[in-house]
Amino acid sequence: MNILIANDDGVFAPGIQALAHALKPLGRVVIVAPESERSGYSSALTLDRPLRPIQISEDVWAVNGTPADCVYLSMNGLFDFEFDLVVSGINSGANLGDDVLYSGTVGAAFEGRLMKQPAIAVSLAGSNVRSYEHAHDYAVAAKWVHDFIQKGLPNLPPRHILNINIPDVAALKGERVTYQGLRAQSKPITSHVDPRGRQVYWIGLAGEAVTDPKKTSSHIQSDFFAVANGYVSITPIQMDATNYDILEDLQTYIG
């Protein structure tokens, strides 16, 4: 099996290094990742300048582009063989709820699925994760991904991926199939004056989880709930954002 690994934290991030090490027993593992952090790039492709893949070492490549660029190049001519699976991650920080709209980790996985291959996005969720600098900090999560893939991935419909969030705990309680939760509105922007006297702004941090009262009665819980309780969250998500429930009503309204 040929496995392509991408991320949005950059080619030297500890999460992707841990993941590559864990998956090598499953087949050939190739890392193609941004040369520096590209968080928040979603599924963006670079169309205004050429991309420059550089081989760092055997089966490790850095690209001066986005996470989706890395997958697109890898599956459209950068290599003389085909990939069987795309794994994006392990992201430094959660991609829960509305995070998937912005996530480069999820964007890379979607790009792989557009290329007709199975794809999963994997993130490590926890308050201390962003300070981790070593691959061993991701060892528990990486082993879980290895075991999950080794068991055989479920067959998903076209244009669907699995968004997986692994809590940063010493002992995982198990897995839960989840729905995509909701976040409260992001915290306000912060304004400062830089050393040259110019007004600059920082976008606020993501909001907290919001409970959806319509779904609390279901035995399927949100991704937020699963992770907060020590379970791996496995959420099937799709590229088609059409709300089919209101199509007929909207057609009637429009006339």
From Swiss-Prot:
GO MF term (any one): 3'-nucleotidase activity
Keywords: Cytoplasm, Hydrolase, Metal-binding, Nucleotide-binding
Gene3D superfamilies hit by this protein: Survival protein SurE-like phosphatase/nucleotidase
Protein localization: Cytoplasm
Domain of life, per lineage: Bacteria
Cofactor: a divalent metal cation
Main function: Nucleotidase that shows phosphatase activity on nucleoside 5'-monophosphates.
Homology family: Belongs to the SurE nucleotidase family.
The name this protein goes by in its record: 5'-nucleotidase SurE
